[in-house]
Amino acid sequence: MKILIITDCHHLLPEEAEKLADLEYDVCFLLGDISGKYIDMLLMYLDKDKVYGILGNHDEFGVLEARNIPNIHCKLIEINGTSFLGFEGSNRYKRGEFPMFTQKEARKLLMKCPKADILLSHDSPYKLYSDGKDLEHCGLKAISKYIKKYKPIFYIHGHQHINSKKTLKNETNVICVYRASIIDTETKDITFIF
């Protein structure tokens, strides 16, 4: 399966969005931190029937629904025999009406969710990329716990503004995407789009 992931497009040029026009993919997930204006630009080049999303820590509630994009936060969906679960937002590091959670809130929500073949989120597992002192980018303990408990085949996220691929001890393939990439779940190849 080819999965198009788009995330953290805080700035997007029309010529970047145009690169999506001829791509072959089975499903597209928006993993947050993409403003409504940029989602509209992306949708000009995407197959709208294949697009799902979750919110990031800078997104306004309702931005996906206003564009008829299914929000899969804490929802399990199945596509071509593969199950996907989404988890939006990040660790709460500031005030405001944005999708952010305390560690306890995230654990309470995510641990009620069912097992999925592929877990998708905006934020990362706790301390995977930092020492935990940077509250904005320290990650969520609930994600680490979910991965340990359910051992998804893939865990894909954004938020860190890096492209990275790691395999954890439990064989979960952890992929951090910055902007746009296609992930082939059979070959485990990653193609960076922009």
Where are these regions (language model features)?
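Conserved catalytic scaffold of divalent metal-dependent phosphoesterases
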Residues: 5, 9-14, 52-138, 142
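Catalytic-core regions built around general acid/base machinery
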Residues: 41, 45-46, 142-149
